[in-house]
Design a protein with these regions (language model features):
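Charge-patterned, long linear interaction tracts outside catalytic cores
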Residues: 341-368
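Structural motif
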Residues: 58-67, 222-223, 340-350
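Charged, often Cys/His-bearing segments associated with DNA-binding zinc-finger transcription factors
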Residues: 1-51, 364-368
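Short, positively charged, Gly/Tyr-enriched micro-motifs
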Residues: 62-130
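Basic, short loop/linker segments at the boundary and entry of helix-turn-helix/winged-helix-like folds
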Residues: 31-79
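Helix-centered, glycine/charged polyanion-binding patches within enzymatic domains
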Residues: 276-340
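Polybasic low-complexity intrinsically disordered regions
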Residues: 112, 116-289
């Protein structure tokens, strides 16, 4: 079954079976916003991937339903609640939202502390990445994707930037080495090491602590921020395929090879589209080695730049999908309202937003 047919069948089932059932159970008819939330939750089905839940608990104090809490966090991203306290207040005051998330009664809504503990458990288990990988493989695993656009976006953190530890540099002797003198070879570059590493190994070696980032925006002005960088691969339709969180100071090119390998393990695609920050020989070679065609804007490096061929320039214009995805994540799905600390929790917060964005964009693309 093709992607559009599969999504249309699912939405038709929801319209014919689920919505009438919800209207019978709820005191107030569902609003359009609530119906949209139901569609997104049914498309993601985050509750299937929750590691610890009451139905599978055998020992210890009974835990609150983690499935309902996970659905509530997705609702938080969709409905643009900045704080967990705002989400909890809305769950207590709105029966429809409470029922959609999975809380039968008002007293079933857990405390803020329970929400916080559950969020920490989800972050530690990498729930967001697991659900996102499953979504991409289920809906796009059999599709041939034309272009994958790769870019990063600044994520402002809520913590102090960590201090960089300066490495002790050993002074080298100047001039030619003496006869019989053996000098240590230079350390291999990170990009060269990444070519022989798996994606998981390369990502683990990238720094992810909160620090200070600097970049030049589209208008040529320099911007600085404290926090992180989220590196995302996006297809032509604006669907995020892979995401990696690093420190703000990490250069974009240092994450490209792990992202290529991650995305290549999920979907088949033809072209890698990247801006001038990714213009490195190792990236061109890695893209070709994986069976893709790299189209990377050339970095002048004080030299005269040869312009792209017309057909390459036309394909490169598809890279705006990445910018639209970054913008939607920040404006519509909580990318600007990071209220947690630590890379694991920040990634979990952003992944809830990316899950909601993936489902919302999938509904738009298929016209459902």
């Amino acid at each position: 079954m093709k992607l559009k047919e599969r999504i249309s069948w699912l939405m038709g089932t929801i319209q014919q079976s689920l919505f009438p059932h919800l209207d019978e159970c709820l005191p107030v008819p569902l609003t359009e916003r609530e119906k949209h939330l139901v569609k997104i939750l049914e498309l993601i089905q985050v509750e299937k991937f929750v590691p610890n839940c009451a139905s599978r608990q055998w020992l210890g104090r009974p835990i609150k339903e983690r499935e309902a809490i996970a659905r509530a966090f997705v609702a938080k991203a969709v409905c643009k609640y900045q704080h967990t306290s705002s989400l909890r207040n809305e769950l207590q005051s709105t029966p429809n939202l409470r029922f959609i998330c999975g809380f039968a009664r008002r007293r079933d809504v857990p405390s803020e502390a329970t929400f916080s503990r559950a969020f920490g458990e989800f972050a530690k288990a990498g729930l967001g990445v697991v659900v996102h990988d499953a979504l991409v493989k289920e809906h796009l695993g059999t599709e041939l994707i034309g272009h994958v656009s790769r870019d990063s976006t600044a994520i402002v953190g809520r913590e102090k930037p960590s201090k960089k530890i300066k490495r002790a540099m050993v002074a080298k002797k100047k001039g030619r080495p003496a006869k019989g003198d053996i000098r240590q070879p230079p350390e291999p570059k990170r990009l060269d090491l990444q070519r022989t590493q798996s994606a998981e190994e390369a990502i683990c070696l990238l720094p992810s602590v909160c620090d200070r980032g600097v970049k030049r925006n589209a208008k040529g002005y320099t911007e600085t921020w404290n926090g992180f960088k989220l590196h995302i691969d996006v297809n032509d339709c604006g669907l995020p395929l892979s995401a990696v969180l690093t420190s703000a100071s990490v250069h974009d090119s240092q994450v490209a090879i792990p992202l290529m390998k991650l995305t290549s393990g999920k979907v088949d695609y033809c072209y890698d589209l990247m801006d001038a920050a990714y213009d490195a020989a190792q990236l061109w070679e890695q893209s070709r080695e994986l069976g893709h065609v790299p189209i990377i804007d050339r970095n002048p490096r004080r030299k005269e730049v040869v312009p792209m061929a017309p057909h390459e320039a036309k394909r490169y214009n598809e890279r705006t999908a990445s910018e639209r995805c970054n913008s939607r994540l920040k404006e519509d799905f909580g990318g600007r309202s990071v209220m947690v600390r630590g890379p694991q929790k920040v990634m979990m917060h952003l992944m809830f937003g990316l899950l909601a964005l993936f489902a919302d964009q999938l509904l738009k693309v298929t016209g459902c």
